Amino acid sequence: MSLPHSLFLVIFGASGDLTRRKLMPALIKIHNGKRFPEHFAIIGCARTAYTDETYRAYLKEELIKSGSLTKEEMETLDDFLSTVHYQSMDPADETTYSLLNDRLKELSPQYENNGNYLFYLATPPLLYELIPKYLHDAGLLKKPGLKRIIVEKPFGYDLASAQKLNKIYAAYFKEEDIYRIDHFLGKETVQNIMVTRFGSTIYEPIWNRNYIDHVEITAVENMGIGTRGGYYDGAGALRDMVQNHLMQLLAITAMEPPAKFDKNGFRNEVIKVYQSLRPLTDEYIRDNVVRGQYIAGDDRIGYREEKNVHPDSRTDTYVAMCLYVDNWRWQGVPFYIRTGKQMPTKVTEIVIHFKPAPMQMFQMKEGLYKGEELIIRIQPDEGILQRIAMKEPGAGFYMGTMEMDFSYDQHDQETGDAYVRLLEDSLAGDPTLFTRSDAVDESWTYFDKILDYWKKHPETPLYGYPAGTWGPKEADVLINRSHAEWTNPCKNLTHSNLYSKL
């Protein structure tokens, strides 16, 4: 994969929150690293009536106000903004696409562009099925030149809507030119899971059912839904986090080593994990899925008191479940996954619980030794921590645990921004870390069964949990069946079992 000589990045939703907070800060880092194509321009599109100059002024003010720019980025900000242009149009109005077409033709001689366009949909999901058709009908997908498109989650609301979107995009773009973005895969610590697994002679031989007792995957937030009530009340935690982010983390944890790490090798192994998930029956869902909704607690309002939320809403803000990957490597190993809003802290991590030695020759002073743990912290305080058995100092042979950890922060190593990596890959035409259409179908096929079950059985419990706590106690009962407990971490990786940030 290599950068084209010239490229236009066309951002729909250019005046929105995602563009301001994520895309532009990432793009200025790529600019400063001199990793843009030789001739490159950004064209922002939205309904707001900006000109090139007023849009640049708006971005400059917002970027400076955010306080996220480094000294170098402040010094090069004007140079970066000189590559930014703006076209006022309504992405929902087909008649305005001719304005965009004319503008791109106008800019093409200046940037030696022969029709190389990368479209980024930073828009509400309801526009996802409209924009490809409008681009096509306006002549913006004609040859010559490469045509790629980046789509944010959610890609579909259920299996039927996801399949409809896949069909629409396949009508106008090649699969290799469709970039369904999941920013979790752009995180350095997520990519490092594969290196830890397949590049380490310590972990690779024991990463299987013979040595691993169970796996936890947690992705929780300490905030409510904010201003997203209108969207979230129609989505819920299962759609918003489990079907995409948690499934990606599960796949990377459980996948087989690809024969070749490229766009097909990696994504083929992801699909195999999805296809190996134990089928969901009504009885299985009833016994292995817990859903919850936060209620008022610790000076925090309940979900039903949030703006734009129905007062009798049954939307899930918490989901915990037990899954099994029924293949040779993982048969019988439970994977416990959970996500939730209004938790005590914001954290995403994977905990691998290894089996204890077959004979307990040494005892602990208190309790039973349950085995060693490997904690892979995705965010915040990114790093890896290994808890291993050690002798307690002093007389006798009592067992204790010792922690060995690596933290990116402590070693002054930047983990990088997920959007930087994913934007760079899309500029270079590398879709490896983006979701393929068959993975979307497989994931929705699996989780549609849970959504259908909840719809058919409205009496399914929706457990309340006070905001600021770790979720409903029924989730504890779920994991206790394996004689295990949830790891409730704090924002710091080291000694995370000792305290939580409330």
Predicted regions and their residues:
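Secretory/organelle targeting and membrane-embedding segments
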Residues: 1-151, 155-502
